[in-house]
C-alpha cells in the first residue's frame, strides 16, 4: 500500500512561490533528500532544467546546493521544455531528471517534479523514500571533498532540436508551409522555432519573448485567440501553440479554427494506421470527446478511457501495450517516439501527416465529428459523497437512458476546488444542454438535502 504523502502529488510538488512548500529552503532540503536517495543507487548525477519563470533561477540554485550537499553532481540545462528534460535524462545517463515548472499555471506558481533514468516519471517508492528523508530533520552535508559539482550543458537545446527533427521521416520537408508558432513566452521559445525552420517551414513566431513574468499570459495553448488571429492575418497554413513547459499543444487550421488534443490524436492515429504503425489501443480520458471514440472505431481502433491526467494516460498505455494516447487539453503521448507528453513532437507528427497526404489540417480532421459537450461546475463541499446520493444516481440513470447509445454522463469531483463537474455529451446539442442544466440543479439541490423531479 502506498504511503500517505505530505508533498508529492500526481505531478510532483507544486504551489505558490513563497508559500510552503515552494520556498528556497524547502527546495534545498528536497534536493538534498533526493540526492541522498539517488546516491544510494550508485549513480551520482542528475540533470536540472526549468521553464522561463523568474523564480526558476532561485529554485535552480537551491536544488543545486541541495544535491551538492548530498554529494550528487548536477548537469544544468537552463530553460528547456519538460519533455526535453526527460529525453536528456536518458541520453546523458543521469540517475534522475528534475523539472522546475508549474506548466500552464501563472508565473507566481512553480513546482518540482522528477523523471527516472528511463525518462519516465520517478517511481512511487523513490518519491516516498525522498519524503521520509525530508521529515527526518535538517540536511547532513557530506565531507567537503565529496561535494557534488555543477556543470552547465551548453548544447542542451541543440541536442533536443536534433532529437525532435529525428522524430519524423528523414525525407519530410516542410518547405512551402507557413507555420505560426506561439511559445507562450515559455520553455519552447528556443527549440520550437528552430526545429520548424530547420525542417524548411516558413515560421512566424509569437509569444517568444519571455521576461520571467509573462509565461502563459494571453498566449499559449490555453489562450489561442492571438494565434488564431495571426494565422489568418499571415495567410498561414497552420498554427501551433504550446503551454509554458511544452508538454501540451493545440493547433489552428488555415481558417483560424482551434483543433484540440482529441482532433490531433485522431490525425496522428489516422496517419499511423495508413503506415501500419499502430500497436494496441489508443488511450484517452473520461473527458475525451465521444466523436473521437466513434472515429477511431471506423479506423478499426479501440479507445481506452482512464482518469483525467497525462500520468494516467501513460500508465494505461503501458498496461495495454499501446503507443498513442492523450487528453483533450493537448497532452499527447507518442510512446513510439518518446517517454512523455511532448508538444513539439506531437505537432511534428501532425505536420508530417499534412506533408505526406498533401492535405490541409482542416481536411485531415474532417473525418472526426465532435459531439456536443456541456460541462457545468456545481459548488459542493463533498463531491464524492454527493455523487452517491440516491437522487443524484437516479438522475444520472435517467439522463443516460434518454441519451441512449449516443451520449455519456460523467460526474467528477474537482481535485483542487470544492466543485463537482457535471459533463453531458450527446448527438443532440439541445438535449445535451437540457440534461446538463437539469443534472446540475439536481446535484445542487441534493447536496442541500433535497431533490428535484425528473424532467
From Swiss-Prot:
GO terms for biological process: carbohydrate metabolic process; peptidoglycan biosynthetic process; UDP-N-acetylglucosamine biosynthetic process. It catalyses: alpha-D-glucosamine 1-phosphate = D-glucosamine 6-phosphate. Gene3D superfamilies: Alpha-D-Glucose-1,6-Bisphosphate, subunit A, domain 3 (3.40.120.10), Alpha-D-phosphohexomutase, C-terminal domain (3.30.310.50). Keywords: Isomerase, Magnesium, Metal-binding, Phosphoprotein. Catalyzes the conversion of glucosamine-6-phosphate to glucosamine-1-phosphate. PANTHER family: PHOSPHOGLUCOMUTASE (ALPHA-D-GLUCOSE-1,6-BISPHOSPHATE-DEPENDENT), PHOSPHOHEXOSE MUTASE. This is Phosphoglucosamine mutase. The gene is glmM.
